[in-house]
């Protein structure tokens, strides 16, 4: 079985890829080979040294479309993946620092990571989309988990369904000139509210800026340390 990896790196985010790739090859589900689908506006030659990387060219958009449109990117390739495989998305700044075996996911259709910034907060304080005219609206009386958008996926058939629905909702809102509060993460949280995934702890998305955590399995590198990052959201 091949494990499919979705990775978006438009613009300067390509600088993160080498370190992510090497860590993923070494520590993420090492029992199986991996195929990487890299969505980028960079030249293909930048990734040509890796034989298991397929480059999918996408247009570089301004913030927040460069993250909001991720579901439409994924639809470009999802149909050609084997339905009995597994597919996972990682943020560009992810680095796997401890081995994560296949047994972590094998019994689950989908996985979701609790957002470390909202782990101990009550639901009314979550940045769920509260506007009633948004397709991803979740009211203040709802209770649940707030998921981080940096690492998700699962069985390819289940992940495909998530992608299709979240893309449909995203496009419906864009037609109304409505941008969800936390962009793609708002749609992910809506979907997971009604389709509960296997919940992974914050150790699977530990922010580097929170300081060292010897138990962390995946580190999210501090993008703000990069000199180019200040221009991303302009």
From Swiss-Prot:
Binds 1 Mn(2+) ion per subunit. Substrate binds at residues 8-13, 93-95, 115-118. One of its GO terms (cellular component) is membrane. It catalyses: alpha-L-Fuc-(1->2)-beta-D-Gal-(1->3)-alpha-D-GalNAc-(1->3)-alpha-D-GalNAc-di-trans,octa-cis-undecaprenyl diphosphate + UDP-alpha-D-galactose = alpha-L-Fuc-(1->2)-[alpha-D-Gal-(1->3)]-beta-D-Gal-(1->3)-alpha-D-GalNAc-(1->3)-alpha-D-GalNAc-di-trans,octa-cis-undecaprenyl diphosphate + UDP + H(+). Keywords: Glycosyltransferase, Lipopolysaccharide biosynthesis, Transferase. GO terms for biological process: O antigen biosynthetic process. One of its GO terms (molecular function) is hexosyltransferase activity. The active site is at 185 (nucleophile). NCBIfam families: Gltr_6. Involved in the assembly of the O-repeating unit during O-antigen biosynthesis. Belongs to the glycosyltransferase 6 family. This is O-antigen biosynthesis glycosyltransferase WbnI. The gene is wbnI.
């Amino acid at each position: 079985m091949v494990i499919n990896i979705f990775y978006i790196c438009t613009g300067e985010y390509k600088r993160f890829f080498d370190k992510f790739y090497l860590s993923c090859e070494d520590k993420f589900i090492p029992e199986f080979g991996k195929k990487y689908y890299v969505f980028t506006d960079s030249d293909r030659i930048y990734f040509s040294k890796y034989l298991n990387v397929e480059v999918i060219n996408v247009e570089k958009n301004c913030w927040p479309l460069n993250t909001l449109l991720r579901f439409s990117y994924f639809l470009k390739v999802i149909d050609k993946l084997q339905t009995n495989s597994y597919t996972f998305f990682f943020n560009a700044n992810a680095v796997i620092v401890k081995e994560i075996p296949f047994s972590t996911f094998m019994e689950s259709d989908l996985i979701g990571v609790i957002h470390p910034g909202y782990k101990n907060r009550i639901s009314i304080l979550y940045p769920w989309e509260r506007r009633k005219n948004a397709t991803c609206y979740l009211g203040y009386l709802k209770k649940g988990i707030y998921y981080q958008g940096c690492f998700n996926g699962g069985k390819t058939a289940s992940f495909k369904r998530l992608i299709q629905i979240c893309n449909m909702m995203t496009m419906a809102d864009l037609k109304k000139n409505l941008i969800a509060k936390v962009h793609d993460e708002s749609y992910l949280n809506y979907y997971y509210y009604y389709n509960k995934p296997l919940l992974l702890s914050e150790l699977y998305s530990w922010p580097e800026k929170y300081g060292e955590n010897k138990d962390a399995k995946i580190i999210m590198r501090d993008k703000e340390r990069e000199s180019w990052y200040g221009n991303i959201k302009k």
